[in-house]
A protein has these predicted regions:
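Short beta-strand/loop motif that positions the catalytic acidic residue
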Residues: 297, 303-305
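Active-site nucleophile elbow and catalytic-triad environment of alpha/beta-hydrolase enzymes
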Residues: 277-293
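Conserved hydrolase catalytic core segment
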Residues: 158-199
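Conserved alpha/beta-hydrolase "acid-adjacent" motif
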Residues: 310-317
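Catalytic active-site module of serine/aspartate enzymes centered on a nucleophile-bearing elbow/loop
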Residues: 328-365
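Alpha/beta-hydrolase-fold enzymes
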Residues: 183-268
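Conserved acidic catalytic loop of the alpha/beta-hydrolase fold
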Residues: 141-162
Length: 365
């Protein structure tokens, strides 16, 4: 049964948000240290036809897997990050403080929580390791297949209680639901659309891609110094795409404040990104399109977007249309408020944790 709802703005939400945040403010310091490791896939074949002799997948985990009488893992949760991010994004207080503590929804003493760095991201294999523009042209299907291999062969996980993905990870969630429909109990995609990337969403990505390729300092990927002009263009695109007008206006109320913040953001972005890694990460979405096979998804889906998301504007009506094709799908559109953060609302768990709770309850066996 599918449903589409628009979350109402409760009068007590600010109080509730404060209570949750205050209650768990010290949780990150109390969490156990995650176990980090690397799984190496040998002769990994990409959809492009290319092969990588060794594909390194970095991961971090909390907790211990629990198995039923048949050896099936019952408590594993896979968290999937966004473009240019890493599994470490889920250690941010606005996520970990709300979900990982004792008695919270993803209590790491109960769940086996897996934070994986995707191909091209974090500490996993990526162009900047040395192959530069000769690195295989990976896409989202390759990334999901490598996640599946990491789980089964690297961690011995044969089933997931939940996949929760944000932004790019949101899109990966749809691919998971179609490619491995029986591997998980539930899906929670946050901040994306289950269709081909087109319109404004494709335009800004194309501008980032062309900005890198057209920069003479990129040198076909064999640069010795980062192409600063290309990265500055990318910084501008990423800032606008991820921005939340209400939050920015509040924090940058004057022209001087806005100018200073802009300069600081570009400086930090350029210093922390590699042009090839960025190009590959953005270009990986080039053939993403789960829409033809949405009916294959058989598990409960809690699909959450926010009304102030520049990348996925609600006025397009795409989410409302496509969720009707998901048998157990439900759409929640979170209205703009003091608590939303544009596209980045996906990591502010206090805003949407009530829907995670409902999903976990609805998908219990």
């Amino acid at each position: 049964m599918h449903a589409c709802i628009r979350a109402v703005r409760f009068a007590f939400l600010p109080v509730l948000l404060f209570s949750v945040t205050a209650l768990s403010a010290q949780q990150p310091g109390q969490l156990p240290t995650p176990k980090e490791g690397d799984y190496v896939s040998h002769d990994f074949h990409f959809k492009s036809g290319e092969t990588l002799p060794e594909l390194r997948m970095h991961y971090a985990t909390f907790g211990t897997p629990v198995r039923d009488a048949n050896g099936r893992v019952t408590n594993a949760v896979l968290l999937l990050h966004g473009t240019t991010g890493s599994g470490g994004q889920f250690l941010a207080p606005q996520f970990a403080s709300v979900l990982f503590g004792r008695g919270q929804l993803l209590d790491v003493t109960r769940y086996y929580v897996i934070l994986a760095d995707n191909i091209g991201h974090g500490k996993s294999s990526k162009p900047s390791d040395g192959m530069h523009a000769h690195f295989p042209q990976y896409d989202y299907d390759d990334m999901v297949r490598s996640q599946h291999e990491l789980l089964e062969k690297g961690l011995g996980v044969n089933h997931l209680r939940l996949i929760l993905g944000t932004s790019m990870g949101c899109m990966h969630s749809w691919v998971w639901g179609e490619t491995y429909p029986n591997f998980m109990d539930a899906l929670m995609p946050l901040a994306c659309q289950p269709v081909q990337i087109a319109g404004r969403n494709r335009v800004w990505r194309k501008m980032v891609i062309d900005g890198v390729r057209d920069d003479s300092d990129w040198k076909n990927g064999e640069y010795t110094a980062q192409p600063r002009a290309a990265l500055s263009i990318a910084a501008a695109m990423f800032y606008v795409a991820g921005s939340a007008p209400l939050q920015i206006q509040k924090s940058l109320p004057t022209r001087d404040a806005a100018d200073a913040a802009s300069e600081d953001y570009v400086k930090r972005f350029v210093a922390s990104h590699d042009a090839n890694d960025l190009l590959y990460a953005v270009n990986a979405s080039r053939n993403y399109d789960p829409s033809p096979q949405l009916e294959k998804i058989s598990v409960p889906v809690m699909f959450v977007n926010s009304a102030d998301d520049f990348i996925n504007p609600p006025e397009l009506g795409i989410a409302e249309r496509e969720i009707q094709r998901v048998n157990k799908g439900r759409l929640v559109l979170i209205p703009i408020s003091e608590q939303t953060h544009g596209h980045g609302t996906h990591t502010w768990a206090a805003v949407w944790q009530q829907y995670l709770k409902e999903l976990l309850e609805a998908s219990q066996h």
